[in-house]
Amino acid sequence: MLVNFILRCGLLLVTLSLAIAKHKQSSFTKSCYPRGTLSQAVDALYIKAAWLKATIPEDRIKNIRLLKKKTKKQFMKNCQFQEQLLSFFMEDVFGQLQLQGCKKIRFVEDFHSLRQKLSHCISCASSAREMKSITRMKRIFYRIGNKGIYKAISELDILLSWIKKLLESSQ
């Protein structure tokens, strides 16, 4: 009788695990916007980011990168990292940007909209603890002062390409 009970509990656990795994696998598609819509939003942001870069001083710090190759690996695999990186751009970078002019404000609004849409597509348990790579990035960003804003904005195309690859890899 005890063996029968243990087998039933085990079967129930296996069934629940499979159901949860299937839900997590399909969570991108069920509650998500059409990928074409997200991809078009990223393409539109590429164009607006190029315009935004043209309105700020050129990034002259060539020996420092905020978005490194290992950062890309984390972005592609870790949803908490994705959320923290997008928050860094929204709060730290755009929060310090002098938003004069409708186009700059519109860019930030569009970026925020994309961030919200992505958060609907990629379900992730939030973490109160900041990841080390984000902490390091913020330390560099604030250490170089206003030039940190120029650096981050000059690397927007890198971030947007990562978002595009993330969308493509989840198809």
Swiss-Prot record:
Gene Ontology BP terms: cell-cell signaling; immune response; negative regulation of epithelial cell proliferation; positive regulation of cytokine production; positive regulation of ERK1 and ERK2 cascade; positive regulation of phosphatidylinositol 3-kinase/protein kinase B signal transduction; positive regulation of receptor signaling pathway via JAK-STAT; positive regulation of stress-activated MAPK cascade
Tissue occurrence: Expressed in HVS transformed T-cells but not other T-cell lines or primary stimulated T-cells. Expressed in colonic T-cells including Th17 inflammatory T-cells; the expression is significantly increased in serum of patients with Crohn's disease (at protein level).
Subcellular location field: Secreted
TM region(s), chain numbering: none
One GO cellular component term: extracellular space
GO MF annotation terms: cytokine activity
Principal cellular location given in the protein's record: secreted
Record's keyword annotation contains Lipid biosynthesis: no
Gene3D superfamilies, A to Z: 1.20.1250.10
InterPro entries for this protein: 4_helix_cytokine-like_core (IPR009079), IL-10/19/20/24/26 (IPR020443), IL-10_CS (IPR020423)
Induction of synthesis: By Herpesvirus saimiri infection.
Leader sequence segment: 1-21
PROSITE patterns: INTERLEUKIN_10
Function: May play a role in local mechanisms of mucosal immunity and seems to have a pro-inflammatory function. May play a role in inflammatory bowel disease. Activates STAT1 and STAT3, MAPK1/3 (ERK1/2), JUN and AKT. Induces expression of SOCS3, TNF-alpha and IL-8, secretion of IL-8 and IL-10 and surface expression of ICAM1. Decreases proliferation of intestinal epithelial cells. Is inhibited by heparin.
PANTHER family from the UniProt entry: INTERLEUKIN-19-RELATED, INTERLEUKIN-26
Complex formation: Homodimer.
UniProt protein name: Interleukin-26
Organism this protein belongs to: Homo sapiens
Primary gene name: IL26
